[in-house]
């Protein structure tokens, strides 16, 4: 039996199991219908009491499984009373799969939002919190508002967490039984919680259970995008301008080679000569010219591989990334590694400064921290291997409530794009005349505008939905199923609104979906098709392709071109064959395989930083949560002193030189003259350590007496500042190491192993530097304690809850940023301290 057959067979078994359990839920319908509203709330309280009296998570999970039929039946009854809707059996099955920590694949229009209410309610009973995660704040707001009515009727609290919320509002939202939020905001709140100086500034509780709507979009499409909080690095932008001027001068093939399959750009020998002349250097690849070659490569990528209105747009002097999967612009997001600055130079807009990373995490590593993770989507089966390998989740295809009536017609392939678009327009005109609504899917903004112009010339009224006019999205989608409607949409993925058919449209054949190009991901094609034929409606879909489409050019359209030429086919005659569809699907699988490998690689590298992040965040949290930090400081002092003795004093030598050691002790631990050469001469290292340690203990005692009752607070402040300063520098160093490590493969080395080894060494060095800094500041600081500590505490409390005398409002929290968005030197520090960035993490 092949791998796919096993999966299909496994899905059948799982559906059978889910069906039996769903029948138990449905069997309780009558029992629930006789309960009063008060009795329903009382059931919730009884469930909560039973679960919350048990602290062990494994035992709690066992109780959850036991009460599932009754809890799900209660939600069905609540839904009937609140919404006048009762979840179907297939929705109950989907809910059971979600509760099991898996992914429910449910077709468009099958009611995923209502399906989620059952596992959300069940898991919220533990009191540990449930996060319902959506791809944008609009969906979070709408869903939380609609579903709060049901959850509150059942006796649970619901919170909504948005980027605009204050710290106090966020804390209240996370304290609720159920919290609606976007994936971005969750990640940023997690990072910010690990940058605070006081426990009361945290907003989140420990991560428990998450249900991700459009799970493939978040865990697959966005997996490679790290969430990053960054500060300004204050580097010059002049090299970007010079590299841009240079890139404009170059000619393809003469000066550089471009591989369309891998999208790699490389200078030729002639290009290298030109670079050396322009930048007035002898050898471009000299180690001192790393910055120059890096900027040239980035400028080439900006000019050759990225296209305006396809990969990014320029709006009001700002470069905005276009999401390749949804067609939306992503304000606030920036390309990393200087690419955004290179595009700004290319487009002649203001070049923003580069940034320095202060905290970062990928979605892959963030979501793996939950006790239980689950999701739902219309399309996930094609990525099942990735879900299983990385997140330990299986995909269960839930049957539809009514049979699917949509007809998916074979692809039509033309020699040129002109022939293809002419045929598309002709098809639209015919369907429009008959009154059948048409949804045209494109993969780029410029394609949607090109087709729009063709339709205008032919007098066909239509709406365009792309990154340039997403404000009208809900209105356009709502009208797309009406009689005679023609809608052009760039990548329909992630559009959270169903297309409902107008009166008389069923008789005309339902919604017709026309794809103008295959996306490199089969999921996006399936999502476009899935907009038609919802809930048993009629509909049809067809893709029009050409040999000039990007996917065909990248993956072997030459054979097809030769075949069409041999057959003497002209531009207006398409091929309709299974061989073509198979070739396209094969190309898509190759791209998906490449993308999966790339995401796995990102995870392998990020895992190095993940382990280090866990150590640092664990250390910070124990400092913040403990009443005193004296034990940790003592350990750091001993460790630093021990290392310095072994480093500076060679006890094997006949006449060791003690001066370097004494200078070090004077600098870090004691005052000048506290120890002399004769005090330690002739002693072995162990005795030297004990002698100096006795003096360090006396110095520490003196410092405690000077500072008094505030000493614990002083220790904690020194510890946190030292950790934060060195950790920020370490992240930046690791980032630089990562960017250059792939070049090691040319020297027959394993880049990942080198990154792991060197990353480990860098981390050890960082920890030693933290210990040395803490030792020095604890013993050597001369502080006006009341002023310094009072200032630190006042701004902290002011950040969280203090009412400012200036405006009577709570201070706004620092905004999060994704890669390369920067924080100005005088802006509030995003760690939440309330200080300016330059006086805090930017110091």
Swiss-Prot record:
The protein's enzyme class: translocase
Keyword Repressor on entry: no
Basic and acidic residues bias locations: 796-825
Signal sequence annotation: none
Residues binding ATP: 91, 109-113, 498
Swiss-Prot/TrEMBL keywords: ATP-binding, Cell membrane, Cytoplasm, Membrane, Metal-binding, Nucleotide-binding, Protein transport, Translocase, Translocation, Transport, Zinc
EC number: 7.4.2.8
Function: Part of the Sec protein translocase complex. Interacts with the SecYEG preprotein conducting channel. Has a central role in coupling the hydrolysis of ATP to the transfer of proteins into and across the cell membrane, serving as an ATP-driven molecular motor driving the stepwise translocation of polypeptide chains across the membrane.
Catalytic activity: ATP + H2O + cellular proteinSide 1 = ADP + phosphate + cellular proteinSide 2
Listed name of the protein: Protein translocase subunit SecA
């Amino acid at each position: 039996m092949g791998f796919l057959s096993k999966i299909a067979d496994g899905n059948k078994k799982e559906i059978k199991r889910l069906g039996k359990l769903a029948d138990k839920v449905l069997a309780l319908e009558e029992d629930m219908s006789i309960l009063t509203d008060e009795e329903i709330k009382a059931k919730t309280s009884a469930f909560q009491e039973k679960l919350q009296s048990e602290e062990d998570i494994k035992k709690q999970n066992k109780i959850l499984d036991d009460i599932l039929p009754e809890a799900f039946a209660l939600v069905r009854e609540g839904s009937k009373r609140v919404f006048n809707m009762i979840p179907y059996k297939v929705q109950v099955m989907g809910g059971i799969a979600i509760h099991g920590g898996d992914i429910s694949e449910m077709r468009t229009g099958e009611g995923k939002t209502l399906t989620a209410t059952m596992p959300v309610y069940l898991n919220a009973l533990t009191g540990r919190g449930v996060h319902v995660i959506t791809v944008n704040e609009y969906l979070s707001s709408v869903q939380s508002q609609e579903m709060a009515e049901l959850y509150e009727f059942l006796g649970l609290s619901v919170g909504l967490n948005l980027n605009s919320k204050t710290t106090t509002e966020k804390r209240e939202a996370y304290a609720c039984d159920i919290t609606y939020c976007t994936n971005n905001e969750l990640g940023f709140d997690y990072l910010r919680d690990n940058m605070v100086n006081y426990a009361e500034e945290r907003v989140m509780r420990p991560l428990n259970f998450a249900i991700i709507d459009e799970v493939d979009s978040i865990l697959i499409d966005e997996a490679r995008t790290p969430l990053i909080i960054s500060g300004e690095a204050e580097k010059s932008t002049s090299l970007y301008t010079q590299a841009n001027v240079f890139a404009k001068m170059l000619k393809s093939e003469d000066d550089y080679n471009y591989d369309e399959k891998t999208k790699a750009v490389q200078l030729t020998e002639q290009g290298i000569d030109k670079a050396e002349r322009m930048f007035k250097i002898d050898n471009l690849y000299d180690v001192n010219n790393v910055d120059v070659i890096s900027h040239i490569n980035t400028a080439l990528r900006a000019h050759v591989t990225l296209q305006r209105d396809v990969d990014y747009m320029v709006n009001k002097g700002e470069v905005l990334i276009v999401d390749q999967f949804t067609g939306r612009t992503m304000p606030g997001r920036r390309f990393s590694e200087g690419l955004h600055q290179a595009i700004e130079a290319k487009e002649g807009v203001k070049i923003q400064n580069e940034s320095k990373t202060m905290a970062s995490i990928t979605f892959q590593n963030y979501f793996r921290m939950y006790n239980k993770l689950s999701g739902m989507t219309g399309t996930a089966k094609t990525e099942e291997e990735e879900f299983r390998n990385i997140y330990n989740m299986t995909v269960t295809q839930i049957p539809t409530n009514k049979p699917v009536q949509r007809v998916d017609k074979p692809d039509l392939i033309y020699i040129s794009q002109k022939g293809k678009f002419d045929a598309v327009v002709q098809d639209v005109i015919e369907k429009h005349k008959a009154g059948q609504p048409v949804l045209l899917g494109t993969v780029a903004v410029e394609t949607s505008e090109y087709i729009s112009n063709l339709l205008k010339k032919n007098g066909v009224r239509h709406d365009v939905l792309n990154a340039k006019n997403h404000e009208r999205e809900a209105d356009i989608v709502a009208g797309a199923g009406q009689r005679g409607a023609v809608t052009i949409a760039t990548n329909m993925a992630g559009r959270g609104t169903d297309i409902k058919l107008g009166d008389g449209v069923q008789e005309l054949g339902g919604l017709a979906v026309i794809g103008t190009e295959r996306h490199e991901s089969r999921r996006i094609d399936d999502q476009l098709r899935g907009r038609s034929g919802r809930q048993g409606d009629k509909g049809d879909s067809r893709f029009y392709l050409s040999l000039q489409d990007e996917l065909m050019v990248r993956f072997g359209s030459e054979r097809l071109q030769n075949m069409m030429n041999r057959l003497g086919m002209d531009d207006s005659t398409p091929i309709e064959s299974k061989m073509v569809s198979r070739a396209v699907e094969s190309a898509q699988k190759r791209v998906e395989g490449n993308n999966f490998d790339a995401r796995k690689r990102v995870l392998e590298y990020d895992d190095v930083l993940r382990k280090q992040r866990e150590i640092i965040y664990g250390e910070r949290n124990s400092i913040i949560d403990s009443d005193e930090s004296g034990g940790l400081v003592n350990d750091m002092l001993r460790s630093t002193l021990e290392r310095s003795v072994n480093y500076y004093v060679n006890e094997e030598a006949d006449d060791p030189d003690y001066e370097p050691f004494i200078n070090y002790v004077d600098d870090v631990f004691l005052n000048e003259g506290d120890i002399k050469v004769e005090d330690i001469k002739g002693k072995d290292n162990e005795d030297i350590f004990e002698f100096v340690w006795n003096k360090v203990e006396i110095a520490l005692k003196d410092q405690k007496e000077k500072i008094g009752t505030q000493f614990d607070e002083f220790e904690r402040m020194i510890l946190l500042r030292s950790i934060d300063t060195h950790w920020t520098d370490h992240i930046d160093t690791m980032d630089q190491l990562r960017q250059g490590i792939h070049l090691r493969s040319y020297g027959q080395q394993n880049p990942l192993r080198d990154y792991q080894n060197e990353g480990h060494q860098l981390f050890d060095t960082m920890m030693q530097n933290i210990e040395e800094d803490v030792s020095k500041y604890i013993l050597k600081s001369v502080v006006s304690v009341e002023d310094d500590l009072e200032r630190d505490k006042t701004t902290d409390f002011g950040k969280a809850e203090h009412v400012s005398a200036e405006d009577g409002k709570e201070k706004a929290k620092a905004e999060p940023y994704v890669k390369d968005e920067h924080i100005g030197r005088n802006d509030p520090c995003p760690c939440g301290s309330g200080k300016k960035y330059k006086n805090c993490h930017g110091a």
